[in-house]
UniProtKB/Swiss-Prot annotation:
InterPro entries: Cell_div_FtsQ/DivIB_C (IPR005548), FtsQ (IPR026579), FtsQ_DivIB (IPR050487), POTRA (IPR034746), POTRA_FtsQ_type (IPR013685). The gene is ftsQ. Residues 1-43 are cytoplasmic. PROSITE patterns: POTRA (PS51779). Belongs to the FtsQ/DivIB family. FtsQ subfamily. Residues 66-133 form the POTRA domain. The chain crosses the membrane at residues 44-64. GO terms for cellular component: cell division site; plasma membrane. Signal peptide: none annotated. It is found in: Cell membrane. This is Cell division protein FtsQ.
């Protein structure tokens, strides 16, 4: 039997040689190293912030604390606050998901509402500011008196008779009138001006202020005289001509001030 002495030194040298050679396989760091690298690079912190932000956003959007609980209505006189709240059902809605303009759109279809604005107040309040149409004129057509605002928009039929000092315009054409339709703004402005200037400048208080589709604005006096003004252009000149005829005592039953050369008639058969 032959004895083979161990080659321990050779084996150790070969092992050291292998360790010195670079490995072709990538080294995989441990979880501690990966955690430290994540902290140093900010990836872990960014991820945590993202998760917390998502949770906070979900809470804010869907938490009951940010749903409308109180609705305040400001500026109503003719309309009741309950009617406004019912027309704009905001209670229970997430405050972040409400479109202010779209929410008040139904209110603008009401003949009583001129403007409407919605304000949202954190965390759970809504305020609706209403500007109502204010009736300043009565428009009488077909025996019905309609409330009309300053811009000429018809509000609704009057439920009571006009006061004694109210401005009533009588539509002799009896054209159909409906809420929210706009009447001739020039005719309304002229009627208001005549109602003030005739008594104060000419001492003439009209028995009636009327409007006709073909004539425009006209007045009737207590002596059953009819004076046609038409539209508001050259109003001062028209008033000067009327004042001259009244002061001169010129008899007439019909006076048309629309042409550049006005004309009048004095009918004795009682017709104008």
């Amino acid at each position: 039997m032959e004895y083979n002495p161990p080659n321990t030194r050779e084996r150790i040298a070969a092992r050291r040689q292998r360790l010195r050679q670079p490995s072709s396989e990538p080294a995989i760091p441990g979880w501690r190293r990966r955690f430290i690298d994540g902290l140093q690079s900010g990836r872990i912190v960014s991820g945590a912030v993202f998760v917390v932000s998502c949770l906070a956003l979900f809470y804010v959007l869907f938490s009951s604390q940010f749903r409308v609980q109180t609705v305040e209505v400001v500026g109503v006189e003719f309309l009741s606050p309950e009617r406004i709240v019912n027309a704009v059902p905001l209670r229970g809605w997430p405050i972040w998901l409400i479109d202010e303009e779209q929410a008040v759109a139904p209110l603008l279809r009401s003949p009583f509402v001129e403007h409407a604005r919605l304000s949202l107040i954190l965390p759970d309040r809504a305020r609706i500011v209403i500007v109502e149409r204010q009736p300043v004129i009565y428009w009488r057509s077909g025996g019905v008196d309609y409330l009309v605002d300053r811009q000429g928009f018809v509000i609704e039929p009057a439920t009571v008779a006009p006061p004694a000092d109210a401005l009533v315009i009588v539509d002799s054409s009896n054209l159909p009138v409906e809420p929210q339709m706009q009447l001739d703004p020039d005719a309304l402005a002229l009627a208001r001006e005549l109602a003030w200037r005739l008594p104060n400048e000419l001492g003439l208080r009209p028995a009636q202020i009327g409007w006709d589709f073909g004539l425009g604005v006209f007045i009737r006096t207590e002596q059953d005289q009819m004076v046609v003004f038409g539209r508001s252009e050259r109003l001062t000149r028209k008033l000067m001509i009327l004042a001259y005829l009244l002061n001169d005592g010129t008899p007439f039953t019909y006076l048309d001030l629309r042409p550049m050369n006005p004309f009048y008639q004095n009918r004795t058969d009682g017709r104008s």
